[in-house]
Amino acid sequence: MRGTPAYHAVSGVPCSACTCTQVAVQLALSWRGSMGRLKRCEVRRRPCALWAIVRVARIGALAAMLAVLSFALGCALVYPLWALAVHRPRVFSVLSGLLYGGGAVLWGLRRVCNALSYARVRRAGRRAAAQEPCVLVQAGEVGAMGLSSSAEVRPAQEC
């Protein structure tokens, strides 16, 4: 049982693939050994290790790139800002106030956009969950797929 992979009945994706973790609890069937019995694909709650490694590598590369950019910008801006602060303190204070205020406005806009996007995704997920049953294989489709008619098909209420 451990060596035989399970496949999603409709998409044909192996259950050990990372896409299996992103699917809601849906029925997935595969042949088990020579007995021809069917088993369910277990949907794990956490993503597989490969995607975790890729995500960490992406975050690390982004952090390194941001560190290099911030260092370069810091070197390019420190001396002119220091000279402006020493020689023209009033201009420096006005510019720093404008930059700080603009940054606060942009931060607030980003928070609002993220909240709206999150609400839209939640609404779409609820709508999709209400419209689609979580069972991939209906009773009539089992015979059409060449599987035995004794396949276990769960009703949507159990999901």
Curated annotation (Swiss-Prot):
Topology versus the membrane: Multi-pass membrane protein
Q: Where in the cell is it found?
A: Cell membrane
Q: Where are the transmembrane segments?
A: 59-79, 91-113
Kindly list the GO CC terms recorded for this protein: plasma membrane
- Tell me which domain of life the UniProt entry assigns to the organism this sequence originates from: Bacteria
Classify the main location. Answer: membrane
The alphabetized UniProt keywords are: Cell membrane, Membrane, Transmembrane, Transmembrane helix
Name the record gives this protein: Uncharacterized protein TP_0707
The record lists the organism as: Treponema pallidum (strain Nichols)
